[in-house]
Amino acid sequence: MRKLINSLVFVALVVTSTNAYSYDSEPEIFIDELVKDAIGTLSDKNISKADKKKKIEIIALENVDIDALGMYTLGSVRKTLDQDSLKKYKSLFEKYFLKSLTSRLTDYSDQKFEIIGSDQKSETYTIVNSKIVESSSQPEIKINWRVYTKNPAKPLIRDLVVEGLSLAKTQKEEFASILNSNNNDINILFLKLEEFINN
C-alpha cells in the first residue's frame, strides 16, 4: 500500500505538459487537465525513462511550490537559521525533492481519474477533491489537492493528501525526527539530504 501511495504521489505532483501555462487557471480544471495529461505522458512507451525524468524535473519546478513546501517541512527550525544556512537548505531540498519524485518513475496505464469537487478555503487556497477510479487491479484511491491561488493566473500545488496521508506533513515529521534526534543540528539534516541526493 505504501508503494502504491508513493507512486500516486509521484503522478499527482509532477506531471503535466512542458508548457505550464497551457492549463486552465480554475483549480478544478487545472488539476483535471494536469493529471489526465500526466497519465498519458507516463504511459507513453515512446518516451524513454531518461527523457521522462528530465521533463519531470522541469514540470515540477513549474507546477509545484517547492520553496514553500521546503520551508513548511523544515518547521520552526527555519527561524533559527542564518541566510547562508537557509540558502543551502533550499538548494538541497529542491534536489532532494526532484530526486525523490523521479526515483518513483514508472509506467501508468488504464487509470481513470475523476474530479469529485472542490472547496475554496480562502482567497489563496482551494482544496480539489479527486479519485482514481477502482479497477480490477487496484481499489479506489481518494486524492485531495491543496492548490495555492495567490496568483489567480498561475495556480501552484503545495500539498496533496492520498487516502488521508499528507505528503507535506509526512515529510515534515521525517525531518523533525532527524533534527530532534540530533539536538536540532541542521548540519545533520544537510548530511542526510546530501546522502540521499548522491546515492
Positions of predicted regions on the chain:
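Low-complexity, intrinsically disordered terminal/linker segments enriched in charged
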Residues: D159-N199
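Sec-dependent signal peptide recognition
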Residues: R2-F10
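A generic structural signal for beta-strand entry/edge sites
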Residues: L13, E123-I127, P152-K154
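Surface-exposed, charged secondary-structure patches
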Residues: K99-I141, F196-N199
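Solvent-exposed loop/turn segments at secondary-structure junctions
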Residues: R78, K95-Y96, E134-S135, G164-L167
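N-terminal signal peptide c-region/cleavage motif recognized by signal peptidases
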Residues: V15-N19
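Early exported N-terminus immediately downstream of N-terminal targeting peptides
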Residues: D24-L101, L105
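Short beta-strand edge/turn micro-motifs at domain boundaries
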Residues: E140-K142, R146-K169
